[in-house]
Amino acid sequence: AGEPANNEDRFNY
């Protein structure tokens, strides 16, 4: 995903 709506796409803690 280039710019995911939710940050969970890039940083899933």
UniProtKB/Swiss-Prot annotation:
It is found in: Microsome; Endoplasmic reticulum. Keywords: Endoplasmic reticulum, Microsome. It comes from the Eukaryota. GO terms for cellular component: endoplasmic reticulum; intracellular membrane-bounded organelle. The keyword Transferase does not apply. This is 13 kDa protein. It comes from Triakis scyllium (Banded houndshark).
